[in-house]
Structures are given as C-alpha cells and as structure tokens.
Amino acid sequence: MPKKKLWGGRFHEKTASPVEQYTQSISYDKKMYAQDIAGSKAHASMLGRQGILTSEEVLLLLNGLDSIQKEIETDTFPWKIELEDVHMNIESRLTDLIGTVGEKLHTGRSRNDQVALDFRLFVSDNISLWKRQLLELIGIFVAKAEEYKDTILPGFTHLQPAQPVSLAQHLLAYAWMFKRDVQRVYECNQRVRVSPLGAAALSGTTYNIDPFFIANELHMYGVFDNSMDAVSDRDFVIEALFCASVIMMHLSRFCEELIIWSNPAFGFVQLPDAYATGSSIMPQKKNPDVAEIMRGKVGRVYGALYNMLTILKALPLTYNRDLQEDKEPFFDTNTTIQSSLSIMADMLAAITFNKNKMASALSDGYLNATELADYLVTKGLSFREAHHTTGSIVALAEQQKIPLEELSLQDFQSICDKIESDVFHVLDYHVSIERRKSTGGTGYHSIEKQIEKLKSWLTQ
C-alpha cells in the first residue's frame, strides 16, 4: 500500500504518477544514507541533551536508525519512490520500526537544512578520499623521479625540442601540480564541513536547539552564520567540482604525454599491456586507450561544474527545488575522479621509460644550443651576439647532418675564433643538466632537494 506523503496534510489529491517519477530523487540520493543517518543521530542526541526529547525516546531513535543502516547495507531496506527521497524513506521506516517516537525526530529540523547537512557530509567524506588518492599518486611520481633522476630527455616548448632536462624534473613537475590539488581540496573541505543544521526551513527555529553540539558530534569545523544562506548555499559543491576539474585537467596533461610518448616515433614510454588495448583489424596495434579515455572524461567533469553554475544562476533566496539537481553532477564527478586517480596510480607504477630512445632524441634537436650560447657569453660576446653566432653553428651542423658535439673544433672556429677545445665539455648533456643549479632547475642537486621536500611533506 502506498505511503502517505509526510507533507500531505493540506492536499486532497494524490500526486500524479508521472510527476512522482519526475520529481523523485531516491533513485540517486540514497547514496547519502550513511550521512543522513549520522546527521539524524546527532540531531536526536541534541534533542535529548536539550530536554526536548526524553532519554528513552533518544535511545529508541538511535537504535532504530542503527537497524535501518543495517537493512540498507544488507540490501533489505524497502525503498519507496512515493516517499521521494532518502530523508523521507528513512524517517518513514523509522516510524514503522519504533512507532510514533519516530515522528519526533524531525523536531526543530527541516528537509532544507537536513539535505544541506547530508550533502556537505557526503562531499566532505569523498573529497577527503580524493586527497588520500592524490597523496598516493604524488608518492609514485616521486618514486619514479628517484628511479630516473639520471635519465635525460628533450624538454619541449611548442611541442618542439627545446632544452635537455632530467626525466625526474619532468615527473616532479606533475608531483608539484598534484600537490597544489591536495592543498585546494584541503582548503575546500574547510568550507564544506560547516554544519547548516539548525537553520530549519530558512529562518531558524523556536526550539532551544544547540547547533554547536551537532557540529561537534559530526566533527564539523563550525556552524552557519545566517540561516537563509545555510539552506540555499551550494558554493561548496561548485568549489569541489572546480577542484575536480583541475585534478582532471592535470591528469589529462600527463595522459596526453603518455599518448605522444608511446607513439613509436617517440618511443619514450612502454605502456604495460594491462593498460593498453589492441585493434580489431590491425594486429600490430597497441593503443593507449586508458590514457585516451581518461583524457576524454575531462569533458564530463567540466560539464558538471558548468551544470552546477547554471543551476545556481539567478536562483532567488532561499531553498528552491532546483537544488535537487545538485547531487548527480557531484555523484558522477566523484566516481570519475576516484576511478581516474586509482587507475593512474596503478598505471604510472607499472610504466617503464626508454632511456635509450630519450638519449637519441637529444641529438636530433640540437638541445645543447643554449649551452653553446651561454658558453660564448663567457668568452666575451653579448647574449644577442652569442645567440646569432650559435644559430650559424647550428645551421652548419644541420648542413653536415650531425649533432653539435660532433662538429670539429675547426668547424666551430670557422664561425667564431673565440671557441676553444673546452666547448666539447660544455656540450655534454650531463654537464648541461648539472650546470642548471638555479632554484627549482633541472640540476641534480635541485632534483634531490625537490625529492626531499616532497617526501618530507608527504610524511607530515
């Protein structure tokens, strides 16, 4: 038999079936059952502490809520679409289990502040998982950097060979990106984990409630300052989705490089078979599908952020039913982020880099040309003059189809008589790396400092 609407006292007609289906949220917001139960238990305890309910009533409520949680987790809970959402389903079931005391749970509370609390707890719980996954991924980048700190490859600008860099420097660049993501998620969580319970529908309540007790019970960082803002605020969802968008953007940049580097024309990286697929017609193919799919999933996360911004655009105070649409963008994004971070961590740990291919690519692009220009400056040329002279020497090497370091001293001196035999030491790629001693540079000492700094931060 269909359940009566808990709000249905002033209505004489039942809700049309298509409307019931159209307006329900139970099909997806039941994901928040644990947060809803935790919030209700804290609320019930507060009502007892304030003398609004008896200790016996509070105990009944708490035991009933525990029973409901067990039913949900054993897949025996009777979800009912006519009860619309997770909140009403749980409250109705509570009354079935413990009788009319269950009807007292909602004292001093509205679904408006209840759903805001549930969603804040859900977002907070899950972005905390993002943070842990990011820390794991950073640790793998740091470990790979240690493994390949003596490996040199072309650094690129405009996707053209530019200067030699340590592979460790390249990998650590991503570690620093994801470190910023950790910081963003942490700072976001400070604003997410603020309790709105006690705001009621929009204007507060006449009951002698204690919002600070509830916040403390739920390990929140504070309580709301304005009841109207508390029930209508979804900035925290937007902020979490922005954090997710930046995380996915960073993942997509690394995915793009894995895709390019795994191309035989580069051959810098060997993708594990477990993270690649083949072709239905071309038996030789090994496609970087995992990286491509992850790169493609960025669009759905960006879309979720834009979705939320649009939902809130021009929305008047306070609660409007539009806000029901705030859940699915975050739910979908949360699934995408957690799966992407998990798969990237496993894939990165299994990847091997081709040192020989990277070494051979250095000579193809005359990546030690900047070293030659700097060398000429030490011989008394202005940088602009050194730049022009180096360009002429590169042209000579191109004409002979050899790397700079294979030119003879006579070849060098035919263009600039200030060049001496010590030029060959300067043109060595390992020397080039070591000479980059500036803060944050690709020099070996800088690499060691970066690794130490990140390791120290990861253990804090």
UniProtKB/Swiss-Prot annotation:
InterPro entries for this protein: Arg_succ_lyase_C (IPR029419), Argininosuccinate_lyase (IPR009049), Fumarase/histidase_N (IPR024083), Fumarate_lyase_CS (IPR020557), Fumarate_lyase_fam (IPR000362), Fumarate_lyase_N (IPR022761), L-Aspartase-like (IPR008948)
Species in which this protein is naturally found: Lawsonia intracellularis (strain PHE/MN1-00)
GO MF: argininosuccinate lyase activity
Entry-linked Pfam families: ASL_C2, Lyase_1
Pathway given in the UniProt record: Amino-acid biosynthesis; L-arginine biosynthesis; L-arginine from L-ornithine and carbamoyl phosphate: step 3/3
Gene that this sequence comes from: argH
Descriptive protein name: Argininosuccinate lyase
BP GO annotations: arginine biosynthetic process via ornithine; L-arginine biosynthetic process
Location within or outside the cell: Cytoplasm
EC number(s) reported in the record: 4.3.2.1
